[in-house]
A protein has these predicted regions:
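Acidic, mature catalytic/reactive cores of soluble proteins
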Residues: 1-155
Length: 155
């Protein structure tokens, strides 16, 4: 996403980077946008504290919602507004708690944005702790801002 957000990469390279994000990090079926894949569990290399998390949990291959918001922002900067809106709705906790089975899986309040969402096979879709800076990160995504403008305009 930073290839797009920084403006430092040529458009061709930024488009390729976002194509890789779509192919490897966006998991529509489970409703998450992963921070990285594969998780650090089969390497002798030590990337630091994230290897201490179980694979698919938090920063070790789960959704880190701050970074997922940057994906949404990068898509809007590229002019992919419909896709950005789709992914934005994947970040909305309400959309993880629409049924009893979703509530049982998410295990986090539907009114609080989770800082992370797990992608571990045994815990896929479970929300982590709500961290105070996560919601403002989401709030500043363009799809959210356009929703607020439409609400104020009475649409």
């Amino acid at each position: 996403t930073w290839a797009v957000l920084s403006g430092a990469a040529p458009a061709k390279h930024a488009a390729r980077a976002m194509s890789s994000v779509r192919a490897h990090l966006v998991r529509r079926a489970s409703g998450v946008i992963l921070l990285l894949t594969p998780p650090f569990d089969k390497t002798a290399l030590d990337p630091g504290y994230i290897k201490g998390y179980i694979p698919g949990i938090r920063e070790n291959g789960g959704q880190y919602t701050h970074a997922a918001a940057w994906v949404v922002l990068a898509l809007t900067r590229q002019g992919s507004g419909d896709e950005a809106a789709e992914l934005f709705h994947m970040l909305n906790p309400i959309n993880h708690t629409r049924s009893a089975s979703q509530v049982a899986r998410y295990m986090t309040e539907p009114y609080a944005v989770a800082a992370d969402v797990y992608d571990h096979p045994e815990h896929r879709g479970r929300g982590g702790l709500p961290i105070t800076n996560t919601a403002p990160r989401i709030r500043h995504c363009p799809p959210c801002r356009s929703d607020r403008r439409e609400a104020r305009a009475g649409r």
